[in-house]
Amino acid sequence: MERIKELRNLMSQSRTREILTKTTVDHMAIIKKYTSGRQEKNPSLRMKWMMAMKYPITADKRITEMIPERNEQGQTLWSKMSDAGSDRVMVSPLAVTWWNRNGPMTSTVHYPKIYKTYFEKVERLKHGTFGPVHFRNQVKIRRRVDINPGHADLSAKEAQDVIMEVVFPNEVGARILTSESQLTITKEKKEELQDCKISPLMVAYMLERELVRKTRFLPVAGGTSSVYIEVLHLTQGTCWEQMYTPGGEVRNDDVDQSLIIAARNIVRRAAVSADPLASLLEMCHSTQIGGTRMVDILRQNPTEEQAVDICKAAMGLRISSSFSFGGFTFKRTSGSSVKREEEVLTGNLQTLKIRVHEGYEEFTMVGKRATAILRKATRRLIQLIVSGRDEQSIAEAIIVAMVFSQEDCMIKAVRGDLNFVNRANQRLNPMHQLLRHFQKDAKVLFQNWGIEHIDNVMGMIGVLPDMTPSTEMSMRGLRVSKMGVDEYSSAERVVVSIDRFLRVRDQRGNVLLSPEEVSETQGTEKLTITYSSSMMWEINGPESVLVNTYQWIIRNWETVKIQWSQNPTMLYNKMEFEPFQSLVPKAIRGQYSGFVRTLFQQMRDVLGTFDTTQIIKLLPFAAAPPKQSRMQFSSLTVNVRGSGMRILVRGNSPVFNYNKTTKRLTILGKDAGTLTEDPDEGTSGVESAVLRGFLILGKEDRRYGPALSINELSNLAKGEKANVLIGQGDVVLVMKRKRDSSILTDSQTATKRIRMAIN
């Protein structure tokens, strides 16, 4: 009521009425803007205005007991007035200074753990080196880059579950931590954050930084890994760049880099196998990168690279809808086309069957070192605007665009026959044939393309057939631009299908990727890549094949031993012995195999001649298709270290050396593992092989007479029991089986039962 009276009183004064009625308030919008809503419209002004007041800050009442009323200089730190509209007190900025200097100390042990990403950034900058500044035109192109170094690769949803579990473990709500990485991180963080006093909200924010990849679409001219992006503002301007070497690596960049190398190796290897798709999947599932399963990384990591995308497609994951040709990523920005098969004649009168794209289309082409805009019609290049780091990169882009245009003058520029093959010795498809041909030598292509006069357009320049720049003339339709072409920004992913030969198609049937598009660049991975698949043993050369083959036999000796005695053919056909065949001289492979198989058969027939070391040593040679011959060998040759080296059939050699005392096997001086049983005992390791058809009943039973040797067992009648002396001088009681059908399981249980009987 008081307020209303006051207002009436004001209005009765003529001056008030005059001000309010005569002042033009023609901008209702402005008044609305500054008076409606809770959002501060001019924060910096508001801040300055507030800070000019004596007590601009409010604090909890308890602060008055923790802070003196005045500081050492006698300035008042808080007001006795309480804040209007809340039960807080008004505090001076000087109170903050006092608190920072004299307030209570808490433990700082958790800070480096919570603010890990910041602490690590400081370290990287401390140890980084900044070089000279160069002034030059920067060709920047927008790319999707990772702006957050040092993160794991969880999806937003996975991270949310981890954060809730770590920060608010007792909150209600369904949280299912399924992936390996989720569980590991949760356990680690819970331990780190015991008794942590930092506000849960802050902890949650910082955890999010650590767990989730954040990407932005930024103009970049140079390194795109996250340790370069974090200093982008220091390393490149509009007309300058500063050289910089990061002072440390981060795992997320290492994962991206190692993933690309692993994927390329796997796709290249799968392409030459009998069933590329099955092989690729087998390898992806059995490979680890830096201790994490490759398939888990593929599910989480958004890296777009040809080989990585082929692996993702094989796993049924969505990938980007752009397609790849000649190492460039093409994205159609407008137009459409239909495809039609057409036969064309090369300059050498060779017939090629190509799929012609009919219709007008525009594309962006983005490569590692060059980018372009391409406009084309049916078998005709209308315009190509290229920008790139150097002449070489620009030429690469021009060749790819000319081939992609399918123009007749390009096809007529072919000299000689086209017979390029892929790694599996299959002919490449015609478009890749043309591409390879001109990548080798584009002289004729550029000469025959044709030249035109050009207008002077800002930022554009012509390019002549010898790749020199010109302002007067240019190859037809071609211009070089100072400006780069941005990468396709959308992160949209589409469902794709993949065929047996690793060709990836979108739902309309357009080929997006194929093994031909996978880069041949070799690099050294930053994280250890462990390929468990035998297909990848070759990647490190012949020695690695040799060591891996023998390691595999030793690791799986229990099963190998049983198969050796019961189903040798199945054993010889195992894919793990495939890589080994490339080490054996082709001319003699068959004879070696026949010889070893005969030797093994004799071992099976003559009881007690079983020799573990010898079986392991010779087994890989038996895998080749055998040739029957009377030839005997005392040593077998393998091609390693650039020459033939010998493996002795009986005894040790530098290639295969078994130390009886330590039971360790060394292959070419490298440790290949330990044999669990002693191969010297004529019968050791033969237990499960020889006690086929006998049931082990238990420990020795004197009622059944003295212990027989294994060789004497064969005289027992079905159902008869006897004590038998096995391997290391132990005696067990056995009974000869009445039926033969259960023989297979015998050898599998024999070893276990013998152990039990002895112990």
Curated annotation (Swiss-Prot):
GO BP annotations, alphabetical order: 7-methylguanosine mRNA capping; cap snatching; DNA-templated transcription; symbiont-mediated suppression of host cytoplasmic pattern recognition receptor signaling pathway via inhibition of MAVS activity; symbiont-mediated suppression of host gene expression; symbiont-mediated suppression of host mRNA transcription via inhibition of RNA polymerase II activity; viral RNA genome replication
Family: Belongs to the influenza viruses PB2 family.
Subcellular location: Virion; Host nucleus; Host mitochondrion
InterPro entries assigned to the protein according to its UniProt record, in alphabetical order: Flu_PB2_2nd, Flu_PB2_6th, Flu_PB2_C, Flu_PB2_CAP-bd, Flu_PB2_middle, Flu_PB2_N, INV_PB2, PB2_helical
General function of this protein: Plays an essential role in transcription initiation and cap-stealing mechanism, in which cellular capped pre-mRNAs are used to generate primers for viral transcription. Recognizes and binds the 7-methylguanosine-containing cap of the target pre-RNA which is subsequently cleaved after 10-13 nucleotides by the viral protein PA. Plays a role in the initiation of the viral genome replication and modulates the activity of the ribonucleoprotein (RNP) complex.
Record flagged with keyword NAD: no
Official protein name in the record: Polymerase basic protein 2
Pfam families the record matches: Flu_PB2_1st, Flu_PB2_2nd, Flu_PB2_3rd, Flu_PB2_4th, Flu_PB2_5th, Flu_PB2_6th, Flu_PB2_7th
Highest taxon listed in the record's lineage: Viruses
One GO cellular component, as annotated: host cell mitochondrion
SUPFAM superfamilies: PB2 C-terminal domain-like
